[in-house]
Design a protein with these regions (language model features):
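Conserved N-terminal segment of class I S-adenosyl-L-methionine
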Residues: 1-112, 122-125, 210-218, 222, ...
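Short, glycine-/aromatic-enriched active-site segment of Class I SAM-dependent methyltransferases
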Residues: 22-23, 138-160, 164-170
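Residues lining the SAM
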Residues: 112-115, 141
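Di-metal (Zn2+ and/or Mg2+/Mn2+) metal-binding site signature of metallo-dependent hydrolases
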Residues: 117, 121
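A short glycine-rich, Lys/Arg-flanked "PGG" loop and its adjoining helix->strand segment in the class I
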Residues: 122-137
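Conserved S-adenosyl-L-methionine
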Residues: 176-186
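C-terminal helical/coil "lid" or tail adjacent to the Rossmann-like core of SAM-dependent
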Residues: 189-222
């Protein structure tokens, strides 16, 4: 029987980190739109007041953004390939191995484009629930729709792209209550689908504008993405899927 790939084996190598987290990626339209969407969801659901840990923080783009908004957010990652040194980032670190005193403080865990890298995500999530005894919420974002599967997913070590049914089932298996679940990046679904169908592959390099002009230009599609996600029905397909779930603690 095939042995499942361990979680530690999913850490990014240098090539993956360079393509997914190039310097300046935080100013690209994709991260601008996702950061805004995430922050709005955290505030809307009252998760912006308590300690937050991003598991699989990569280069720390999300942590830096949320801290600028005044949130108490830190990050950890199994890899140290992409992130700059920061007192708020714990690199080459498994979340389950962080200091117990800190783990007891954390109320919310962010897993943003993380669990698709895990061959068996349910045991992975259950272990986090055990390691963080006062955990109340998971905020999870994943790549969506199997018809968008491409060379990008293969290169970055994805095991799957999700739909709502699949993600709901995993949340059910960990005993969590779904509070929010919806697709986002709806504006990117059709271009992504056409790219896969017509070209058979997509660009692996995440956009990272360098000049002030290109940074300003990236704000335009970011705003268009945010507007389309706001105005279109939640059931409409997007290239990503987000859920917020409450952890049901066992009594006794």
């Amino acid at each position: 029987m095939k042995t499942p790939i361990s979680v530690k084996e999913t850490a990014y190598n240098a090539d993956q980190a360079a393509l997914d987290f190039p310097p300046g990626a935080e100013d690209g339209y994709w991260y601008l739109a996702r950061n805004n969407h995430l922050y709005n969801q955290l505030k809307k659901n009252g998760l912006d007041e308590s300690p937050i840990l991003e598991v699989g923080c990569g280069s720390g783009i999300v942590v830096e953004f949320l801290r600028k908004q005044g949130l108490d957010c830190k990050g950890c990652d199994l890899s140290d390939q992409a992130a700059k040194k920061s007192p708020y980032l714990f690199l080459s670190t498994d979340a389950n191995d962080m200091e117990e005193s800190y783990r007891k403080k954390v109320k919310t865990l962010l897993l943003l484009d993380v669990i698709e890298h895990i061959e068996e995500p349910v045991p992975f999530l259950k272990k986090l629930q055990t390691s963080f005894p006062n955990l109340e919420y998971f905020v999870i974002a994943v790549p969506a729709r199997k018809e968008l599967w491409s060379n990008y997913d293969v290169f970055f070590g994805h095991f799957r792209r999700y739909d709502m049914k699949m993600l709901r089932q995993e949340m059910k298996e960990i005993g969590a209550k779904v509070l929010v679940m919806h697709y986002f990046f709806k504006l990117l679904y059709l271009p992504g689908w056409l790219t896969v169908k017509l070209l058979g592959k997509r660009n692996l390099q995440v956009g990272a504008p360098q000049s002030s002009f290109s940074k300003a230009l990236n704000r335009i599609p970011a705003a268009m993405i945010r507007f389309s996600d706001w105005i279109l029905p939640r059931q409409w397909w997007g290239s990503s899927l987000l859920t917020i779930v409450r952890i049901n603690k066992q009594k006794g």
